[in-house]
Amino acid sequence: GDAAGQNMVGRATFAACGWILDHYEGIENFYLESNFATDKKASQINIMRTRGKRVTAEATIKREHLLEVMRVDPKQIDYHGRVAGVGSFLSGVNNTGLHSPNGITAMFIATGQDVANVSESSAAMMYSELTDDGDLYVSITIPSLIVATYGGGTGIGTQRECLELLDCYGRDRVYKFAEIVASVVLAGEISLASAISSSDWVSSHEQYGRNR
């Protein structure tokens, strides 16, 4: 739905459990949460079953644009992606990308989302390949993006205004908003992958970082 629905689900579940407690004897212990919902926590079940919205953003970038603007060859980024995939496997993380939480957190704060949900929302699968023309195809899939365009913090003045700027406030807007968030993440992934692959990452931080 357009609301994240977490509070609604909690209330409905609590009411249903209350009915069970009233009608069945012998229940010794009852807890509304047992951690299987993995609220505010990254988990494999969210990647497989989805909690929130599952969304994919993809792009094909011309080789000449990468060389001119990002100063990197598509082959460098593609190979870097394979190396990063091995690193992700060895470290046991739930993300084969580089820094999806940065873009997601920025969007969440600006638009009144529950920032604590960045934990499960930032899981991502990054994929790239070279096209027959030597261009770069990239995609990112976010399996559990918990977003809303109505309810909760989305109604706060500035946050609602940001959603309205994106034409994403209110009913029937949440899937559009999810696509925008995924696009922001993909743009950040391409930028950082290019910076690392071209060895501009550290020098850029030194020149433009917060301590300057």
Q: Could you describe each region identified by the protein language model?
A:
Residues D2-G155:
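Glycine-rich anion/phosphate-binding loop at the beta-strand->alpha-helix junction
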Residues Y137-R212:
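Internal helix-turn-beta structural module
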